[in-house]
Each structure stands twice: as C-alpha cells, then as structure tokens.
C-alpha cells in the first residue's frame, strides 16, 4: 500500500516536472514565433532527407521569412535561430551562457571534455591552463612551422601551375593545415601533404565527415538512431586510430608536453592526466585544421576573383619581405601585412569558417525583451549577420576597405562581425589562426599568381554549413608561376 502510494506520488511529480518543462518551453517558444510545424515532428520535415546545400538554402529561406530571431522544433528539440546582433551580444558577452548547445555533443566522442566542449568549472580551469600556449613568444615558434609547411605546400602546387589546369585547392589546403596543427599541437609530423592516404589522414577525414553529417542529417542527430547506423561503426574505427595515435605521442613526449605547459598545469591542484591532455590535443587538431582550411580556401577564391586586390596584397608582401622567395617570414613581418589583414577580415565576414555558434539556455532567461525557455539550444549565425544589409552596406560586395576606417564595420558593430565568436568563450586560438592564414597566403602569392577558372568552368556560389563552412563545389582556381 505504502509502496503504491510512493510510486503514484513519484509518477505525479515526474508528470508535473515534464509538463512544466515541455509545455513551458512550448509556451515561450510560441511567443518567439517561427514556421508552422506538425505534432511530434515539429519542423523536422523541412530538413529531413535534404542534402547539405539544400539544407542550407532552406535555413536561409526560413531566416528571410521568419526574421532575425525565431524558433524551430526538431521533434522535441527546441532550436532558436539568432541573426540579431543585439541578441547575439547579450548571449555571447555573458558568462551566464557559456554552456555549448547540443550540436557540440557530436564532437565529444573525439574531443571528450576539451576546451571546445567542456562547461562551467572544467572549462574555466582548462582555459586558464591553455591561454599561455598562445603567448606571442610561443607564437613565434609556431610561425617557423607555418613557414616550413608552406614551403612543402608551394612545392605540391608546382605541377598545377606548370599545366595551368583548374583544380580544387580546398583538399590540398586541408592537408597543409593538418601538417601544421599536428606539428604545433603534438610536436610530431604526419606528413599529410606527402602521405595523403595514410591511415591517420584517412581517419581524420572520416571522423570530420561523420561529425559534419550529424549536424544536418536529422535522422543521425539522435544517439539512439545513430548507434544503429553504419556511421557509428565507422566512427568507432576512426576514433581507435586517432586516439591511439595521440596517446602514443603523449606517452613518448610526456616530458616535452609537460614543459610546453610550463610544468605547472594543474586542475584542482593535480597534474593533467593523459586523457585530459589527449582531449586538449585532439581539440587543437579539430579546431586548428578545418577552420583555417575554410578561411584560407575562401581567401584564395576571392583573390582569384579580384586581381586588383590580389595585386595590392602581393605588392605589400614584397615591400615587407623583399623578392627573395627563399627567405622565411617571421611574426614581426606578418604583423606588417596590414592590407592583407583587411582582406582576411572581409573574407571572414562573407565566409566565416564557423557558420554558427551554439549555446544552451539552462534556465528561463529574458534577453532583449524575449523569454528564452530553459533547455533551448540557441544557434547564432554569423554567416547571415555578415551578409545582412542592415549591418553592412552592400554586403555581397567584397570590399576590404570597409574595415579600414575609424568607424569600421568591425568597430562600430562589434557583434555583427564575430568570425571568432566573442565574449568569454571566444576562440582562444585566433592569433594562431590569423598568423597561419597570413603565412600560407603570403607564401603562395610570392610564388604564384592566383587565377579564376575559365568562364565555362565557373559555378555559382553554394555552401554546406556544417560545423565548418564548406563550398559545395570546392574552390576551383588556376595558378601561374611568377617570374
């Protein structure tokens, strides 16, 4: 009798809790507005079975129809899409909203509780430990790696320049960026540019593909369904290779890695475990190769389309480093590439490497006169903010000079231009990334002129917005060797 009463009371309490949680979210979400949905499915039918480019176009059309802040239901999952700079500022600038949204859970099998995916206390501790890694003195050492790997890259491009063929530069940049981040993060080389079909390189490609797949494939978003698919088995196989490689490096370089962390890295007064080191190294591996690949590739694409801008960048590079192509570029010289800096900023405005940032709302919150219900995933979209005429004049026109004036787009609209996120969870490696982009771009331009495809090979811009922004049809360019 007593047991029955306890069970009944427990069931009632659970029902009340679920009712308040779900129907409270329904109530506040209805006030936000968004496209009409269906019972149980919500808006999932908008996106089910759509390939990535169509998924992106559907999202773009929904933004145009629903405004700068609206809700989407993917089954029981509530997403609130934000392209309003004021709302983005309120969320990104506040230490209250540092928990990442559910989309980042797709990274956890590879990255564990690294800096990108961890929350609250662990994130604060990890951030404090890792920040010194990007001090400018250490960055100078990384620039040497950038230059060495860039030399290999321009050698790999030579056959393309000699034939004058049109080719997709994106996968080649990926291999170079992978070599850079492996040597920078682990102090070892995987020779991805030379051994592009090695087991490790294939595993990186496989795991990044699966992570990206889960961001747009509605059926694979949910762990129950994903665990039944062949992708789960493929993921496990790739992770065995990736974690095994990182663990072997840690074991062989334990002392060197400890010194790189000044020998004082602790969490709650204890040294980092091998697993914690692996999580941070793997986080660098993921964040450090895919994001820079996207940025460099779209930058090369724009330089090919705008020969006048390319010429100005080239002239600036030569004025700083001279005409001897064999001389390496140091950090001080990279910092003198002021016009190239403007071109990079304009590229990231139109093609942010990370097209969205996600945050989880842990309690009902009033933000910019909107009540965001607890449990909602907030998706902030810098891609669409960067192309919004309310925020940027003539936004589809590539004009680096918009960042040069005292009242530049970057300064007057700080949360309308957030390619590296902003606030307490901004990208810790942005100086590293910008230095790498400048180093590789300057090396390419010292050796080659970048040309667009022939007219009959031209394709309209089309994007895949996964964790990283990718071009649907690659980045086709041609090269001409400089005399």
Give the residues covered by each predicted segment.
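Cytochrome P450 heme-thiolate monooxygenase catalytic core
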Residues: 99-107, 118, 141-294, 312
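Conserved cytochrome P450 K-helix E-x-x-R motif and the immediately C-terminal K′/meander segment
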Residues: 45-61, 65-67, 244, 248, ...
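Cytochrome P450 heme-thiolate "Cys pocket" and heme-binding signature region
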Residues: 132, 287, 368, 406-437, ...
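C-terminal helix/juxtamembrane-tail motif
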Residues: 2-4, 13, 468-483
């Amino acid at each position: 009798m007593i047991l029955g009463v306890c069970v009944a009371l427990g069931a009632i309490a659970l029902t009340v809790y679920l009712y308040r949680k779900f129907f409270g979210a329904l109530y506040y979400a209805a006030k936000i507005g968004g496209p009409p949905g269906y019972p149980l499915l919500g808006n999932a039918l908008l996106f089910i079975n759509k390939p990535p480019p169509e998924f992106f176009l559907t999202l773009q059309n929904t933004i145009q129809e629903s405004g700068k802040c609206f809700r989407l239901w993917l089954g029981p999952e509530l997403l609130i899409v934000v392209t309003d700079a004021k709302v983005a500022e309120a969320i990104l600038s506040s230490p209250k909203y540092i928990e990442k949204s559910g989309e980042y859970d797709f990274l956890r099998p590879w990255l564990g509780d690294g800096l990108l995916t961890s929350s609250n206390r662990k994130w604060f501790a990890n951030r404090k430990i890792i920040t010194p890694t990007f001090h400018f003195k250490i960055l100078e050492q990384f620039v040497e790696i950038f230059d060495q790997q860039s030399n290999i890259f321009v050698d790999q491009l030579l056959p393309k320049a000699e034939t004058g063929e049109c080719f997709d530069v994106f996968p080649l940049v990926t291999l170079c960026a992978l070599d850079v981040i492996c040597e920078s993060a682990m102090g070892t080389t995987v020779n991805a540019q030379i051994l592009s079909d090695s087991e490790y390189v294939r595993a990186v490609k496989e795991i990044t593909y699966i992570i990206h797949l889960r961001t747009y494939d509605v059926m694979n978003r949910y762990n129950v369904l994903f665990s039944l698919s062949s992708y789960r088995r493929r993921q496990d196989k790739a992770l065995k290779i990736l974690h095994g490689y990182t663990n072997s490096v840690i074991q062989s370089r334990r002392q060197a890695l400890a010194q790189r962390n000044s020998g004082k890295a602790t969490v709650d007064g204890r040294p980092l475990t091998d697993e914690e080191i692996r999580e941070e190294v793997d986080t660098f591996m993921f964040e450090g190769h895919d994001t820079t690949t996207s940025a460099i590739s779209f930058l090369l694409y724009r330089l090919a389309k705008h020969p006048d801008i390319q010429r100005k960048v080239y002239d600036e590079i030569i004025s700083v480093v001279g005409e001897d192509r064999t001389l390496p570029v140091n950090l001080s010289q990279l910092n003198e590439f002021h016009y190239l800096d403007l071109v990079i900023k304009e590229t990231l405005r139109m093609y942010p490497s990370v097209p969205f940032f996600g945050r989880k709302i842990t309690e009902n919150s009033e933000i910019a006169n909107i009540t965001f219900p607890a449990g909602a995933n907030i998706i902030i979209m810098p891609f669409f903010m960067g192309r919004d005429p309310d925020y940027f004049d003539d936004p589809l026109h590539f004009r680096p000079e918009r960042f040069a004036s005292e009242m530049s787009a970057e300064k007057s609209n700080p949360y309308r231009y957030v390619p590296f996120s902003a606030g307490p969870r901004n990208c810790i490696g942005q100086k590293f990334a910008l230095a790498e982009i400048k180093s590789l771009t300057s090396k390419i331009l010292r050796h080659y002129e970048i040309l667009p495809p022939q007219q009959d090979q031209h394709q309209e811009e089309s994007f895949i917005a996964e964790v990283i922004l990718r071009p649907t049809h690659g980045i086709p360019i041609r090269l001409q060797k400089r005399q």
